């Protein structure tokens, strides 16, 4: 994606965020009114990438360094890069190791045979190659894949509903 295309996209997204802020029902998510926090500093993002051995997808990186670093929406809010929640939920993640799932081989629990699913979780397979974008709470999370064995998967957004899988 060219830098001009990214800039145009970011401008459209920023305009839409302003419109969403004025239309959002303040009772629909915790924390009241929707707020977007300032963009993250480029050196801080570069340091995070170096620490974890990954390069963030260009469009996400541009958004968090030029539009908003985090916010109070959607759901429980857009997570700030590298900042754990109150339960220190990032301590188990390894964003630099490849995300093991693919579009044809997602992590799915088969109620008829749950063992492979639970074995994969025990091995930490669900904790590799991604960063959290936001959470609905109770184990329902939207994630961004930042490292993947399958190059087509890197940069895609997945929904983890580990609380309700089996």
Q: What are these regions, as identified by a protein language model?
A:
Residues 130-132, 141-164:
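Low-complexity, glycine/alanine/valine/leucine- and proline-rich hydrophobic stretches
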């Amino acid at each position: 994606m060219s830098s001009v295309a990214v800039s145009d996209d970011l401008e459209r997204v920023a305009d839409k965020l302003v419109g969403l802020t004025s239309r959002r029902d303040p009772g629909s998510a915790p924390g009241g009114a929707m707020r977007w926090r300032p963009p993250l500093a480029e050196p801080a993002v570069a340091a995070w990438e170096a620490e974890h051995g990954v390069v963030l997808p260009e469009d996400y990186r541009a958004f968090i360094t030029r539009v908003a670093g985090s916010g109070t929406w959607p759901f429980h809010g857009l997570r700030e890069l590298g900042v754990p929640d109150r339960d220190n939920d990032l301590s188990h993640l390894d964003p630099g190791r490849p995300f093991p799932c693919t579009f044809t081989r997602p992590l799915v629990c088969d109620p008829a045979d749950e063992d492979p699913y639970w074995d994969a979780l025990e091995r930490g397979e669900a904790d590799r190659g991604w960063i959290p974008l936001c959470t609905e709470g109770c184990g329902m999370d939207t994630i961004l894949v930042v490292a993947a064995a399958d190059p087509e998967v890197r940069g895609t957004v997945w929904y983890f509903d580990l609380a309700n899988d089996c």
